[in-house]
Curated annotation (Swiss-Prot):
Its EC number is 4.2.1.9. It catalyses: (2R)-2,3-dihydroxy-3-methylbutanoate = 3-methyl-2-oxobutanoate + H2O; (2R,3R)-2,3-dihydroxy-3-methylpentanoate = (S)-3-methyl-2-oxopentanoate + H2O. One of its GO terms (molecular function) is 2 iron, 2 sulfur cluster binding. GO terms for cellular component: cytosol. PANTHER family: D-XYLONATE DEHYDRATASE, D-XYLONATE DEHYDRATASE YAGF-RELATED. SUPFAM superfamilies: IlvD/EDD N-terminal domain-like, LeuD/IlvD-like. It comes from Nitratiruptor sp. (strain SB155-2). Belongs to the IlvD/Edd family. The active site is at 477 (proton acceptor). This is Dihydroxy-acid dehydratase. Pathway: Amino-acid biosynthesis; L-isoleucine biosynthesis; L-isoleucine from 2-oxobutanoate: step 3/4; Amino-acid biosynthesis; L-valine biosynthesis; L-valine from pyruvate: step 3/4. It comes from the Bacteria. Binds 1 [2Fe-2S] cluster per subunit. This cluster acts as a Lewis acid cofactor. The lineage of its organism: Bacteria, Pseudomonadati, Campylobacterota, Epsilonproteobacteria, Nautiliales. Homodimer.
Amino acid sequence: MRSDEIKKGFQRAPHRSLLRATGLKDEDFEKPFIGVANSFIEIIPGHFFLNKYAAIIKDEIRKCGCVPFEFNTIGVDDGIAMGHDGMLYSLPSREIIANSIETVMNAHKLDALICIPNCDKITPGMIMGALRVNVPTIFVSGGPMKAGKLSDGTPIDLATAFEAVGKVAKGEMSEEELYQIECEACPSGGSCSGMFTANSMNTLMEAMGIALKGNGTILALTPEREELLRKAARRICEIAKDEKLTQEYKIRNILNEKAIHNAFVVDMAMGGSTNTVLHMMAISKEAGVDFPLSKLNEISKHVAHIAKISPSLQTVHMEDINKAGGVSAVMKEASKRSDTVLYLDNPVIEGGTIGDRIKDAEVIDTSIIHPIDKPYSEVGGLAILFGNLAEEGAVVKTAGIDPNMREFTGKAICFDSQQEAIDGILGGKVKPGHVVVIRYEGPKGGPGMQEMLAPTSLIAGMNLGDKVALITDGRFSGATRGASIGHVSPEAAEGGVIGLLQDGDEIYINVDTYTLEVKLSDEELEERRKNFKPKVKDIKGRWLRQYRSLVTNAANGAVLKDEC
């Protein structure tokens, strides 16, 4: 066992002495040590109950004859951090989480790992850390919350609340109506109920085989979710107690190139958050897999978009997907298309393969998960755009775009920060036909690559979603919809063309040809570059300054450089 390094032999008597202080007995030194990486934090709705989940898991681990050691990571709630400088810390928190997993697991030589993530950057951070350690690992998330409901039965969620702010600003909704939405949008614990970043990533973990069947859709705080916790605990112990299984089920043996491909197939079929692209690029690097951004468009061409979930379809939420058959049903239905490549032979953590897992799955409600011959779209719900404005790529959630906006030409109106853009939108500067440009919000420029949910929600709430596009070197919340193009690389802070744009420049967007261009000649761009000096923001936070000096761009997953 890996843990023998801290518990076997006379030289480890001091180590055992310390472990005895935690309650261990002689017999415990013969058992596998299981890390339980929790992300319990009281301020996040998807995490405030995870201490109870960890207790269930630890109890089951003990019953199975192993020794659990719980430790915690930090967490940032993107919704609460939204709209102020707290959002600068969201993406950087992913790196702290990954580092904490690597640190605790390697410092204490634990044999195997269960991770309990749920929201935002916590899930990808835990995956990245687990890949570095490369021991058998099972992920079991906290689960999605129920959708809210208005008094008339209309389903709502957090995206409804953000967009309602725009309606109030435009005078189309009263503050009393906004208050009703505020009180009903998030009715229970869990990750926000739509196909936002948290649920997108929890779904993709299931698709990759590192989480058990049902992980992406079984609601939080239900008996079914608690049984999933117990199953995960039993399985990790079964693996850790068998040396052959321990070698076979190291996380890198499961989360390989085929698993990443399968994740993107599901992402396309369900129209996941654009943040999944950023995180999966980072995960692929940690897994040692070369997976270029351009490959996503090739996948998209051969995957039908068969499930629309809020924010793309505001009446459908994760609980509906669960009732309709869950992620396995989506995968099985998607695989029926002859040109869709889904690697059914790839292993899953419970044993067997993806093919074994989805063999008996079926779509129970075809109004929620569409038949393969009646998709929402013949192509996937995400696209990577290229052109002189995004030489290394930009990301758009095509599932959330009005059909009239799939090809769009508009005049640039430029803002050098998210707050400038918010002020401009609320001040009436943004008109139909504009392309809102928000720059210096990339990984380096922000620093921290803020989510632009406030501006996109204001645009949607002010009924400009089919008349205005937005491009940014920042990123978006999973709750964003509309012609919102993010992750523009290179970013302004590293000299990208987005930094050269001026008000009135003509910008051309075509999601069907994967194009993002400014209608300027190479000569004009080169002339502008002669006098261009990227802005550098005055940042007070020491961690943010360190992050800015180390982070790579969005096309590389915004991972940190190995060396300065």
